[in-house]
UniProtKB/Swiss-Prot annotation:
ATP-grasp domain: residues covered: 133-317
Entry keyword Transcription regulation: no
Binding sites annotated in the UniProt record for ATP: 159-215
Pfam family, any one: GSH-S_N
Source organism (scientific name): Thermosynechococcus vestitus (strain NIES-2133 / IAM M-273 / BP-1)
Enzyme class: ligase
Assigned GO CC terms: cytoplasm
E.C. numbers: 6.3.2.3
Protein name as annotated: Glutathione synthetase
Keyword field: ATP-binding, Glutathione biosynthesis, Ligase, Magnesium, Manganese, Metal-binding, Nucleotide-binding
Reactions performed catalytically: gamma-L-glutamyl-L-cysteine + glycine + ATP = glutathione + ADP + phosphate + H(+)
Top-level taxon in the UniProt lineage: Bacteria
Gene that produces this protein: gshB
Length: 318
């Protein structure tokens, strides 16, 4: 059984952090032969999608005294081969954002993979449909007060009404470009103009949730069901808890409120073929739905002694 992973260059991944590596290790442990490729290596010929793929053998990380120990080298590559993606049991689309033109074109290629032979996850159509900031807006009962606009006056009014707000670019990742806005800040107009490219680019504004100081919970969902969570806590003067911005991680429980949020999302996630998802929850409110390359599995496994990748593969092969 062969499984393909469409990823960023393998040497750029961090095996002690990247969920893609955890999934590849789990697939290998389950007896699958793992192959890797990149979006630039896709080909359509006679209506069939091919890829230049490389088989990979991984040396799994080991948990020692609460930390991941990484073997060196941690992977070994075989010979490059061109293969139709229809010959794989599953194809994981795990290319990191941004969702740019090249990314979108790759999803159109993946539309041609035969669903009778191969599961593509997440669904290419679902990836196009689910902007990671805006997808949450359909679930109005579980999100904080939110607007999306490029209009400076509307943004100023929202900040004035809330007192404090968080501005998010619609295409960012890892906390990039997120700003804390406060009524009365003399730099407010400048921050709005820069973020919206002088009113040409819409951004998201959400009410500031004081619970953010206590952490931003990442919950991993598999086919709509929560399977693990980790809390990401801001450090120093930083208001963002993202691991990419230096947030520290702590073990987290999946609460009844978290389960209610997941139940609210589950039908839409299943409808859109979004099988492996990471949602962000602050103070009992859904703030983002991460579908492109959600992370957090390594941190959850390290803090809880779990192996979520094994659970994912058991579902995939069932």
């Amino acid at each position: 059984m062969d499984i393909a992973f469409i990823i960023d260059p393998i040497a750029s991944l961090d095996p002690g952090h990247d969920t893609s590596v955890a999934l590849m290790e789990a697939a290998q442990a389950a007896g699958a032969r793992v192959w890797v490729t990149e979006i630039s290596q896709l080909l359509i010929r006679e209506g069939q999608v091919w890829a230049a793929l490389t088989p990979i053998q991984l040396s799994p990380v080991q948990l020692v005294d609460g930390q991941w120990q990484i073997p060196q080298p941690w992977f070994e590559l075989g010979a490059l081969e061109w293969r139709p993606l229809n010959t794989f049991r599953a194809v994981w689309m795990r290319k990191d954002p941004p969702v740019n033109t090249a990314y979108l074109y790759a999803t159109y290629c993946l539309d041609l993979v035969d669903p009778q032979t191969t599961l593509v996850l997440n669904s290419p159509a679902g990836l196009r449909h689910a902007n990671e900031k805006m997808y949450a807006l359909q679930f109005t009962s579980v999100i904080p007060k939110t607007i999306v606009t490029a209009d400076k006056q509307r943004i100023r009014e929202f900040v004035q009404q809330q007192g404090m707000a968080v501005l998010k670019p619609l295409g960012g990742k890892g906390g990039e470009g997120i700003l804390f806005l406060q009524a009365g800040d003399r730099n407010l107009n400048s921050m709005i103009e820069i973020s919206t490219q002088r009113g040409q680019l819409p951004v998201m504004l959400q009410e500031y949730l004081p619970a953010a100081k206590e952490g931003d919970k990442r919950i991993i969902l598999l086919n709509g069901e929560p399977i693990g969570a980790v809390n990401r806590i801001p450090t120093g003067d930083e208001f963002r808890g993202n691991m990419a911005t230096g947030g520290r991680v702590a073990a987290a429980e999946i609460t009844e409120r978290d389960r209610q949020i997941c139940q609210t999302l589950a039908p839409a996630l299943r409808r859109d073929g979004l099988y492996f998802v990471g949602i962000d929850v602050i103070g009992g409110y859904l703030t983002e739905v991460n579908v492109t390359s959600p992370t957090g599995v390594r941190e959850i496994d390290r803090l809880n002694g779990t192996r979520l990748g094994q659970q994912v593969m058991a579902w995939l092969f069932s």
